Amino acid sequence: MMPTLNEDQRKALFAEVPGWTLQSERDAIQKTFTFADFNAAFGFMTRVAIKAEQMNHHPEWFNVWNRVDITLSTHDANGLTHRDADLARFIEQAAKGTGAK
């Protein structure tokens, strides 16, 4: 089983990926991204989907028009792992590249 992030690793992650919040009901992080329109949101989701498939680590997400809600957690570890941290970093880059607000 993959180890979950320790407290220092979590602090470092939150410093790198602003706006993500720890969910109170489980060991997962969440963030909402807003884009100019549906095409921009879908383009962002496509970039994330390709990376997630390469990593074999998939987000939980929900999309309505220009908004994308993303939750990350490693189900096998029952919590946050380095895979969530790596994907969150990529998601931040992808969001900036597609004009997220």
UniProtKB/Swiss-Prot annotation:
<keyword id="KW-0456">Lyase</keyword>
<dbReference type="InterPro" id="IPR001533">
    <property type="entry name" value="Pterin_deHydtase"/>
</dbReference>
<comment type="similarity">
    <text>Belongs to the pterin-4-alpha-carbinolamine dehydratase family.</text>
</comment>
<dbReference type="Pfam" id="PF01329">
    <property type="entry name" value="Pterin_4a"/>
</dbReference>
<protein>
    <recommendedName>
        <fullName>Putative pterin-4-alpha-carbinolamine dehydratase</fullName>
        <ecNumber>4.2.1.96</ecNumber>
    </recommendedName>
</protein>
<dbReference type="GO" id="GO:0008124">
    <property type="term" value="F:4-alpha-hydroxytetrahydrobiopterin dehydratase activity"/>
</dbReference>
<dbReference type="GO" id="GO:0006729">
    <property type="term" value="P:tetrahydrobiopterin biosynthetic process"/>
</dbReference>
<dbReference type="InterPro" id="IPR036428">
    <property type="entry name" value="PCD_sf"/>
</dbReference>
